Swiss-Prot record:
Subunit structure comment from the entry: Homodimer.
GO biological process, any: proteolysis
Protein's name in the database: LexA repressor 2
InterPro entries, per the entry: LexA, LexA-like, LexA/Signal_pep-like_sf, LexA_DNA-bd_dom, LexA_repressor, Peptidase_S24_LexA, Peptidase_S24_S26A/B/C, WH-like_DNA-bd_sf
Swiss-Prot/TrEMBL site (Cleavage) positions: 88-89
DNA-binding region: 28-48
S-S bonds: none
CDD domains tied to this protein: S24_LexA-like
Lineage, opening ranks: Bacteria, Pseudomonadati, Thermodesulfobacteriota, Desulfuromonadia, Geobacterales
Organism of provenance: Geobacter sulfurreducens (strain ATCC 51573 / DSM 12127 / PCA)
Family stated for the protein in its record: Belongs to the peptidase S24 family.
Amino acid sequence: METLTSRQRTVLEFITAHVDRHGYPPTMREIARHLNVNGTLGVAKHLEALARKGYLQREPGNSRGITLTGQTRHTPTVSLPVIGVVRAGVPQIATEEIEEHISIDQSLVKGGAFFLRVKGDSMINAAIIEGDLALVRPQQTAENRDIVVAMIDGEATLKRFYQGADHIRLQPENPNMAPIIVRSGVQEAWIIGKVVGIYRRMD
């Protein structure tokens, strides 16, 4: 079967979950609401592509006329939220607002994982650029050299982690930028999670 774009996979995952939960497929308007888009024209195009690629069949004139093919369930996927913005540069508040959902292979993640969108160029030498989606596994500890999402005085930043005797160092991967030094009792800082993958859209 042909590969799917991230948006097509999100639609397919939502349809599959809806069928599993309710016993019948969603309408195009329900899919549009899930994608947080106005109108159903884009949804119709995604459904046409999924049908053309063999993942489902459509019944014209039926608002719920979507039938999943048997091959659809061979690779379990999970739909993860994209939340807020992490600024890879000067820390910026990460608003916990879900922008969209992206489906990936379920075997790649554990419960609670999410995507954060990267902004800035402080991690370019780690091949992380503006617009990338950082796949974050929630955890409160890290090892030296882990790339983490950390909160500093209520602001989020994505950096490489180093533990010192009385401080932590959040190191950018850009020689033109200085590290962030967080000393015990001076600033409030904690780790949100470890970056375990980077996803970049090519479309």
